[in-house]
Amino acid sequence: MANLNKRPDWIKVKAPNSTEYYNTKDLIKNLRLNTVCEEAACPNIGECWSKKHTTVMILGSVCTRACRFCNVKTGRPDLLDPHEPQRLAEAVQKLNLKHVVITSVDRDDLEDGGASHFAECISEIRKSSPNTTIEILTPDFLRKEGAAEIIANAKPDVFNHNVETVPSLYKTIRPGARYYNSLSLLHNIKKLSPDIFTKSGMMVGLGEEINEVVQVMDDLREAKVDFLTIGQYLQPTKNHAEVAKYVTPEEFKYLERVAKTKGFLMVSASPLTRSSYHADEDFQKLKENYQQKLVS
């Protein structure tokens, strides 16, 4: 049996050590912004921050959910910061970002789940950086009537909401969420605003079966999702769900091939793939693939 306490060589990454990495870190700190890169202990932080790519986490640093895979703090959430959208827009401008990814903690305590705050962030970025494309990675807005409409009207270039895992694992891995609610949210955004690219991602290595992963692909295509990401689950701490399997690079290539046969415009599948990993480059490929589909 494989030693799951030791990560395989294909998972290992270099420790961050570049000047640009520290410059990005200082800017984020000085503007009092949170990033999912830090809070979720992302393995790609060194590479991304060295390129001045960062995923800002809005709506505070404390989540109202306690998913078994996630390293973000859970508990009583922070007060909403009305100046956060302006500081975020300033960071985008100072980093000279061509493409920005914005995510958030879950805010079940807010009437709209934080949807209007996302909309304000998009609006502020559009004012100061009109040529920057905007990708948002949102919570599921469970039982938040009108949230999808607020998001669709804000017109992000990409709407991302992750299903995270297969439905059979939701009770243990994502107990506060509902699989079919996530599918419904993705479908509703596309229905409300067909010109917004939709995206979703999932982790593997949590104990799912291959046929379950393929079924999720089919469900996402039924919801008109354009872009699928698949990455290896990594246990943040001993208090989180254990890794059931380290999926090999060859198995990821197989999943990518299968996903492409389903009709996704874009598929990214590898051990280190995360929702916002190479998001700027992937967005360009996504647009190119869409244009090719139009003329084919």
Curated annotation (Swiss-Prot):
Binds 2 [4Fe-4S] clusters per subunit. One cluster is coordinated with 3 cysteines and an exchangeable S-adenosyl-L-methionine. One of its GO terms (molecular function) is metal ion binding. GO terms for cellular component: cytoplasm. Its EC number is 2.8.1.8. Residues 49-265 form the Radical SAM core domain. Pathway: Protein modification; protein lipoylation via endogenous pathway; protein N(6)-(lipoyl)lysine from octanoyl-[acyl-carrier-protein]: step 2/2. It catalyses: [[Fe-S] cluster scaffold protein carrying a second [4Fe-4S](2+) cluster] + N(6)-octanoyl-L-lysyl-[protein] + 2 oxidized [2Fe-2S]-[ferredoxin] + 2 S-adenosyl-L-methionine + 4 H(+) = [[Fe-S] cluster scaffold protein] + N(6)-[(R)-dihydrolipoyl]-L-lysyl-[protein] + 4 Fe(3+) + 2 hydrogen sulfide + 2 5'-deoxyadenosine + 2 L-methionine + 2 reduced [2Fe-2S]-[ferredoxin]. [4Fe-4S] cluster 1 binds at residues 37, 42, 48, 276. It is found in: Cytoplasm. Its main location: cytoplasm. Keywords: 4Fe-4S, Cytoplasm, Iron, Iron-sulfur, Metal-binding, S-adenosyl-L-methionine, Transferase. Its cofactor is [4Fe-4S] cluster. SUPFAM superfamilies: Radical SAM enzymes. [4Fe-4S] cluster 2 binds at residues 63, 67, 70. PANTHER family: LIPOYL SYNTHASE, LIPOYL SYNTHASE, MITOCHONDRIAL. Belongs to the radical SAM superfamily. Lipoyl synthase family. This is Lipoyl synthase. The lineage of its organism: Bacteria, Pseudomonadati, Pseudomonadota, Alphaproteobacteria, Rickettsiales.
